[in-house]
Every structure is written in structure tokens, then in C-alpha cells.
Amino acid sequence: VLTGNVTEFLDPIFSSGVMFATVSSQLASKLVVRKLKNEPVDWDNDYHDFIGQGVDTFRTYVTAWYDGTLERIFFSKNPDPEIKRQICSVLAGYVWDQKNPYVRDHAVALQRLVKLIDVSERLSSF
């Protein structure tokens, strides 16, 4: 079982390494205990898929930081406080909160939001 940065190293700037190390180690230890008790453990489903979903979500945000997407969102003319809260929640490590649309739809949500901001700001300039 790989845990922490061995699972996936994303970026040296963000603090995701500590969060992923903690969550992956905690989950792995629970699954090892189950396995030692001869209980069934599906490592792909119970561990890999769960951790992978969190890593994929956070990777979207690391990429968005470096390509300017997050800057465009945070410094738009009329930032929506609720959207900023939802995005900051992801950056704080809540990458498994499926109630948050910026987790659930992370692969497309940020790009849609930037397009909406661009259109809104173009229309407001008329």
C-alpha cells in the first residue's frame, strides 16, 4: 500500500502532501486491520479509487493555479463569495466533499466558471 507523496506527488507549493499523507495513511491502516482480521478488502475500490478521486480533484486546482484560471476567478470584477468559499474549501483539503459542485464536477466546473466570468464582464462593459 502506497501512502502520502508516494501515492502521487502533485506540487511542492500546495500543502496537499500533508493532507494526502494523513488521509491515505489513516485509510490504509483501517484496511490493513480489516485484512488482518480476515475481512474482505477490495484495495482498488476501498483505497485506490477513493484516494485517486481526491488526487484528481486537487490536481485540477494545482493546474488551475498555474494556468491562471484560479487567479481569473478570484480577481474577477464581481467575485461570488459562495463560489470563492466552495473553491477555498477544496484548496483547504476538502477534496472528497461531493456536495461541493467544485469537487463533484471539478474537471469542468472551473473552466465553465471562467467562461461565465468572461462573458459577464464583456457584457457589463456595454
Residue ranges of predicted features:
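C-terminal helical "tail/cap" subdomain of flavin- and related membrane-associated enzymes
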Residues: 30-126
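Short FAD-binding loop at a beta-strand-to-alpha-helix junction that anchors the flavin cofactor
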Residues: 1-13
